Amino acid sequence: MCPGNWLWASMTFMARFSRSSSRSPVRTRGSLEEMPSVHHPFLNVFELERLLYTGKTACNHADEVWPGLYLGDQDMANNRRELRRLGITHVLNASHSRWRGTPEAYEGLGIRYLGVEAHDSPAFDMSVHFQTAADFIHRALSQPGGKILVHCAVGVSRSATLVLAYLMLYHHFTLVEAIKKVKDHRGIIPNRGFLRQLLALDRRLRQGLEA
């Protein structure tokens, strides 16, 4: 299993950091429905973190967060037996590097591969990959029997950010709606830089709908 204790410890650390950086307290328990601010047109980063710290915080090596869309970690990406059992046809690796992830790793499985060389840093511009990743996910799920694993090292930040962007771009979810949908199935915690980029996407998409 994805180490739930590790994820909770990370959330607790970030919550403490947020409290020292903002007057708004970070809530680490409760249900998503208890969040009074989720109906606000746009949340700020600290409010989004409060939302992320509520509800489900555990995760497996991979969790189906949308029909046919699995969000997971590097261990699942390396497990050919599990990929075959789940019927995975596509893999999107958000932590691609020279040493981690190649199309050749899936030779004989009939899996199509896309690598995104992203760093889990607030300074990294993930937004340049939003559309390409969303298009790849959409193509995977549009084919008969298509199933996709979107992963990074742990499956909670880089890959989660790309999944959220996909739901926003192709299914017209707001960012809050996308977070709640994914968190119904898996704990996630995109870094603050990624949250700001998703907020910018949220504003752009909603302004386009209102135009």
Curated annotation (Swiss-Prot):
Keyword Electron transport among record annotations: no
Gene3D superfamilies named in the record: Protein tyrosine phosphatase superfamily
Tyrosine-protein phosphatase domain segment(s): 60-207
Subcellular location: Cytoplasm; Nucleus; Golgi apparatus
SMART domains: DSPc
Highest taxon in the source lineage: Eukaryota
Any one of the GO CC terms: cytoplasm
UniProt-listed GO biological process terms: negative regulation of ERK1 and ERK2 cascade; negative regulation of MAPK cascade; negative regulation of transcription by RNA polymerase II; positive regulation of cell adhesion
Keyword terms of this UniProt record: Cytoplasm, Golgi apparatus, Hydrolase, Nucleus, Protein phosphatase
Active site: C152
Entries under PROSITE patterns matching the protein: TYR_PHOSPHATASE_1, TYR_PHOSPHATASE_2, TYR_PHOSPHATASE_DUAL
EC number(s) per entry: 3.1.3.16, 3.1.3.48
GO molecular function: MAP kinase phosphatase activity; p53 binding; phosphoprotein phosphatase activity; protein serine/threonine phosphatase activity; protein tyrosine phosphatase activity; protein tyrosine/serine/threonine phosphatase activity; RNA polymerase II-specific DNA-binding transcription factor binding
Function summary: Inactivates MAPK1 and MAPK3 which leads to dephosphorylation of heat shock factor protein 4 and a reduction in its DNA-binding activity.
Homology family: Belongs to the protein-tyrosine phosphatase family. Non-receptor class dual specificity subfamily.
Subunit and interaction comment: Interacts with HSF4.
Protein name: Dual specificity protein phosphatase 26
UniProt organism field: Rattus norvegicus (Rat)
